[in-house]
């Protein structure tokens, strides 16, 4: 089996519009949760979120291209551009046919859905844009990334709620490790700050009115945000051969299903996934120096 390494990183998020900005904000302990400005909040109980401030899509895409891109797809393309430039790979130069593109998203084109429901039910429009469906589909980011960069290997999207991008990276990792492909562009993207989406989350009564504090006894719930993070992964052998910068090695991946409550996770399921990951990577618990938790605060 091939060893798999990360050779390119790209981030476009509320916490930073590049990988460098994102890292700097993390190290400084900054928060990007603030009052929402991109949608009307009069009908909302929770009026805060992690939105990308001062985002102008025309700085990244032509008007013709924007007609095809939901907000969540826009973010993925911007992050993918940074990751691919960072990796130093030109996929059109040859490796594209041996490269996969696998992107995760739990919600897909919510902005497009919201806008078009408003046109139909509030404004009484009879016709919608002919590309409404391709624009909102969950595989839109993957498709646009492959077309923009000449990637012709396996490409698909994964939807598994908050685990979507993690599962996407895991599947991409297994494809590279097995030798099915040599490289992969993978990660996740979301743009969930729409009126309809927020009202749906409010109905679950899991939204915090101020901030997300998952490890506090005073936690009040979660806060929705938006953004994308993409990485380029490849065989260690090829990365060394081309003198690529290597950020990290992916040692293993594991996943499980709770098969229990519709919203309440089980400790056994999480423990099983972690054990599966350790086993897959040939590691012991004492080998782990950092754990990144999924802290919903609920």
Show which residues each predicted segment covers.
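Conserved beta-ketoacyl condensing-enzyme motif
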Residues: 6, 21-22, 27-160, 189-197, ...
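Short acidic, glycine/serine/threonine-rich loops at helix termini
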Residues: 16-17, 112-115, 169, 194-200, ...
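Short loop segments at secondary-structure junctions
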Residues: 88, 179, 234-238
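Short conserved active-site loop signatures built around small residues
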Residues: 165
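Condensing-enzyme catalytic core mediating Claisen C-C bond formation in acyl metabolism
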Residues: 3-7, 30-34, 207-283, 287-290
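Stable alpha-helical structural segments in soluble proteins, enriched in small hydrophobic residues
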Residues: 75-87, 168, 273-281
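Short, high-confidence coil segments that cap the C-terminus of an alpha-helix
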Residues: 181-182, 288
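Short beta-strand segments
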Residues: 7-10, 102-104, 159, 184-190, ...
